[in-house]
């Protein structure tokens, strides 16, 4: 069986470092291992419309922005197929068929859907398209025969529901659909990076993001104003690591080599944490260190992005070719499922 990855993002804005450590960095690593036969990266504009239908320009204008972020971060069109979801009608068709395999009550019980409904204040009036998001996601996964789906921990209920749909289809008809394996982020800090203000989620709407496209000055300003330990008032005060956003970011980004270059008084992050917990280490010092780490990590991405942005014709050509390739695969899957289910047997 071919090893295939499917992953992607909703184009509701430029990508930030939460996207980067949560999935994008891992995608680049997986792409470069050569261990997978196909890697499909989806710009999920159709799914983005489920809660942005009154503002389609927001979605449309960010397709190119997300594509820029993808390629700037290291996704290679020669190794990964980057495509636009709405330009593959077979995905909508698959979603329609799978809707018959799921009850409304099951969709309403999905923990991820419930959390997203609350966050978006949809309790009084839930868009049907939003409620059916897990079904659409299942169509995406199965259309490209994905064997591996990298997700954050908050998306696990969505993948479990996708497996349920796959299992039900295979039980009713023939076992032609593949149940995908789940691939979680590398470490706990990467599961869901908090915002710079210490909020549980980095969010464009909350204004607490560091974007991949941010300038060095913007990155520094955001880091220097970052939430730390409110009880760590004096340098001599013992500090807390748990819930300290600066240390969460260091967990996600820094290596021992960073200490050699920027903070040679310490061998590694564990030593820095121990000193902070004892007291005698100021927030300004660790913020300056984090700024050096982040500038080193993000500078090559920003520079590649600036170069790519000078030739958007190339970027859109990549999307066009990727979408054409992805549609061929989705059409093959749709044909197979119609044949298996005898849906068009008399035609």
Show which residues each predicted segment covers.
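N-terminal Rossmann-like or analogous alpha/beta NTP/dinucleotide-binding catalytic cores
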Residues: 2-139, 296-298, 302, 306
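Active-site catalytic microenvironments for nucleophilic, acid-base chemistry
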Residues: 26-29, 33, 165-172, 346
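Mature, solvent-exposed C-terminal subdomains and processed small-chain segments of exported/organellar
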Residues: 278, 283, 292, 296-315, ...
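Non-catalytic DNA-recognition/assembly elements of restriction-modification systems
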Residues: 317-321, 325-329
């Amino acid at each position: 069986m071919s090893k295939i990855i499917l992953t992607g993002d909703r184009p509701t804005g430029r990508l930030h470092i939460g996207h980067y450590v949560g999935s994008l960095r891992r995608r680049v690593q997986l792409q470069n291992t050569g261990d997978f036969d196909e890697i499909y990266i989806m710009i999920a504009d159709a799914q983005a419309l489920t809660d942005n239908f009154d503002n389609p320009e927001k979605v449309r204008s960010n397709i190119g922005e997300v594509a820029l972020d993808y390629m700037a971060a290291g996704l290679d069109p020669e190794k990964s197929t980057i495509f636009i979801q709405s330009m593959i009608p077979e995905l909508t068709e698959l979603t329609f068929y799978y809707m018959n395999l799921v009850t409304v009550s099951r969709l309403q019980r999905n923990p991820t859907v419930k959390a997203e409904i609350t966050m978006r204040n949809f309790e009084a009036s839930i868009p049907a398209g939003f409620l059916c998001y897990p079904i659409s996601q299942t169509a995406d996964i199965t259309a490209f025969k994905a064997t591996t789906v990298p997700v954050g921990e908050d998306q696990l209920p969505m993948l479990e529901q996708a497996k349920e749909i796959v299992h039900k289809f295979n039980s009713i008809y023939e076992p032609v659909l593949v149940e995908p394996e789940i691939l979680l982020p590398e470490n706990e800090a990467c599961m869901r990076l908090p915002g710079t203000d210490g909020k549980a989620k980095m969010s464009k709407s909350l204004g607490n993001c560091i974007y991949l496209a941010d300038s060095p000055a913007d990155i520094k300003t955001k880091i220097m104003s970052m939430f730390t330990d409110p009880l760590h008032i004096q340098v001599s005060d013992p500090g807390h690591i748990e819930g300290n956003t600066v240390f969460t970011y260091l967990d996600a980004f820094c290596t021992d080599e960073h200490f050699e270059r920027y903070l040679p008084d310490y061998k590694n992050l564990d030593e820095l944490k121990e000193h902070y917990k004892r007291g005698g280490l100021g927030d300004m010092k660790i913020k300056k260190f984090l700024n050096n780490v982040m500038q080193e990590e993000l500078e090559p991405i920003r520079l590649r992005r600036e170069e790519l942005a000078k030739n958007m014709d190339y970027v859109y050509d990549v999307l066009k070719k990727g979408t054409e390739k992805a549609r061929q695969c989705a059409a093959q899957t749709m044909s197979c499922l119609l044949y298996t289910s005898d849906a068009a047997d008399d035609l």
